[in-house]
Amino acid sequence: IQNYALKQYGGDLALGANGIITSVGMLQVMLIIGIAQGMQPIVGFNFGAKQYGRVQETLRLVIIISTVIMGIGCFCSVAFPELIARAFTNDPALLEVTANGLRICLLVFVVVGSQIAISQFFQSIGIAWKAMFLSLSRQMLFLIPAMLLFSRFWGLDGVWYAAPFSDFVAAVTAWLFLWYHVKSMKGKQEE
């Protein structure tokens, strides 16, 4: 769906730019996935031992670290998109399309770190459906409809703007799931 929209509104240059943007984004996301997966045994063990303070502290630390890493990546992608794109291509037309796409697509990438960490947290404590929902929400549930809608109004920029919209809505959803979970856990601890 994304490649079709990119081809329709931006041609081959948009497809090439998307390959570069995806690579840049995945480099950042892979770091966060590694950190979040490292959190899982710590959270799982302490959750099973009913050491909820340790669980909260571990999750808090991972969210902070993930947000800082993604914040640095987000800043660099928005502030220096041409420089980043030059690591992949020296074609002037592709550089221009890629720089614009990087600036837009990774605009709110800072929130993706917490979204991934929260998703991995739910997997760690055995709430698989929430983890699965959060994992699918960013790249499917919110991205595809936004891309189809936004591209009709704004063309190629609409395809690009669907990514930060999806990232933001998925992060808000993750935080709402976490807030509700913490609230319900406090109620259980008081009983």
In which residue ranges do the predicted regions lie?
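Small-residue-rich hydrophobic transmembrane alpha-helices
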Residues: 18-75, 79-81, 112-131
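Short runs within selected transmembrane alpha-helices of multi-pass transporters and secretion channels
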Residues: 32-36, 105-124, 130-139, 159-175
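Helix-terminus/linker motif at the lipid-water interface of multi-pass membrane proteins
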Residues: 1-23, 27, 45, 83-92, ...
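N-terminal membrane-sensor/transducer module of prokaryotic signaling receptors
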Residues: 6, 129-131, 149-150, 156
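Alpha-helical transmembrane segments of multipass membrane proteins
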Residues: 1-5, 27, 75, 117-121, ...
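Alpha-helical transmembrane segments of multi-pass membrane proteins
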Residues: 20-28, 92-118, 145
